[in-house]
A protein has these predicted regions:
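N-terminal phosphate-binding caps/lids of nucleotide- and nucleic-acid-binding domains
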Residues: 1-191
Length: 191
């Protein structure tokens, strides 16, 4: 969902950094539109969305996310730091949440776009943390989601790094066929 937010923000480059198959860190960095400080705090509230103003807007949605639940749900079970800046702002902002509690908001130097770090997933819900599968299984899920989003937007560059090692470095592609070749190899794309 973090990648989908980046795509929805108009990013043309999205980087995903994962440590320990996502248990320790999931970080998504983009060069999209970013958020102003008020929206950066508001986005962590349940059902907060900038995509629906009237009921008619539901028929016009062309984005991945619109319900305004993902960031609130993530912030409930992890330590989250969001850095963001819009084009017109000189200084960005940093917002910190843990276990649904708003810990801090402050100004920070950051590039245009959004950088969100999710640390210590399920640290406050030990029973849920126990249900995580092995690192291999959890990382396979990360790769599946990364691939799913990368396939939907071949014109966007995507990078996936795990434990300091680049897994995928996908440059913007001319078409879905070229993106499939980058992800799965030329033999699969021919089929």
């Amino acid at each position: 969902e973090l990648m989908e937010n980046s795509v929805d923000a108009g990013a043309d480059q999205v980087t995903v950094v994962v440590m320990d198959s996502g248990r320790t860190l999931i970080q998504v960095i983009d060069n999209g539109s970013g958020m102003n400080p008020d929206d950066a705090v508001l986005c962590f509230e349940r059902h907060a969305t900038s995509k629906i103003a009237t009921a008619d807007d539901l028929n016009e949605i062309l984005t991945f996310g619109f319900r305004g639940e993902a960031l609130a749900a993530i912030a409930a079970v992890a330590e989250v730091t969001l850095k963001t800046r819009t084009e017109g702002e000189e200084l960005g902002c940093q917002v910190e949440f843990a276990a649904s509690e708003h810990l801090a908001t402050r100004g920070t130097a950051t590039p245009k776009g959004t950088n969100i770090s999710v640390r210590n997933l399920f640290y406050n819900v030990p029973a849920r943390r126990k249900f995580l599968k092995s690192d291999n299984v959890e990382f396979r899920r990360v790769v599946e989601e990364f691939t799913r989003v990368a396939l939907t937007r071949p014109s966007i560059g995507f990078t996936l790094t795990h434990n300091g090692r680049d897994i995928f470095v996908l440059k913007p592609a001319k078409s879905l066929k070229f993106r499939i070749m980058d992800l799965l190899g030329s033999t699969v794309a021919k089929d």
